[in-house]
Design a protein with these regions (language model features):
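Short, well-structured N-terminal submotif of metal-dependent ribonuclease cores
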Residues: 1-39, 50-64, 129, 140-144
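Acidic, PIN/NYN-like endoribonuclease modules and their adjacent C-terminal/linker elements
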Residues: 103, 109-144
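Acidic catalytic patch
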Residues: 68-91
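Short, flexible loop segments at the rims of nucleotide/cofactor-binding pockets, characterized by
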Residues: 15-17, 90-94
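Alpha-helix capping/helix-boundary segments
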Residues: 9, 44, 79, 101-102, ...
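Phosphate- and divalent-cation-binding pockets in alpha/beta enzyme and binding domains
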Residues: 47-48, 82, 124-125
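Short active-site oxyanion
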Residues: 33-38, 68-71, 108-113
Length: 144
């Protein structure tokens, strides 16, 4: 089991004023206390590298966290097959390609918690995997 961060969860770590920053940090601290990996798909990083200032902040964050149980999971053929399988099982188009990366990183570990700002799409992708929990970064709004 591992904690997996999607792009918005990583963005929260880059901005101390982000509403989910504290929630993500607490989850990372809990994972470390339990000696669990914190995973980020490198495909997720592609969503975040958006210019010099942001790139530097992201690289600094990754450097700070790298020695402390952080797993940067590259997309090799094995992960690519898993991502393709997730999309196929969910009857999803390539529009969910980026969302499939963090789910795949959790699935390959045998399960985990994925923190995300997009719980509906990730829950759709993770539906066949009972050991993957999708944790929304923001509380759900009540529907009327």
């Amino acid at each position: 089991m591992r904690l997996v961060l999607d792009a918005e969860a990583v963005s929260a770590l880059l901005d101390p004023r982000h509403p989910a920053e504290r929630k993500v940090r607490r989850a990372m601290e809990a994972a470390r206390r339990l000696r669990r990996e914190v995973g980020i798909a490198t495909g997720t990083l592609a969503e975040l590298y958006r210019g010099a200032g942001r790139d530097q902040a992201l690289d600094a964050l990754l450097a700070r966290e790298s020695g402390d149980g952080l797993l940067l999971r590259d997309t090799d053929r094995t992960l690519a097959r898993l991502i393709g399988a997730l999309l196929t099982e969910a009857h999803a188009s390539s529009a969910l390609f980026a969302d499939a990366h963090p789910v795949a990183v959790a699935v390959e570990a045998g399960g985990g918690v994925v923190q995300t700002a997009d719980p509906d799409d990730l829950a759709r992708l993770a539906a066949p995997y009972r050991t993957v929990v999708i944790e929304p970064l923001a509380p759900r709004r009540s529907q009327r």
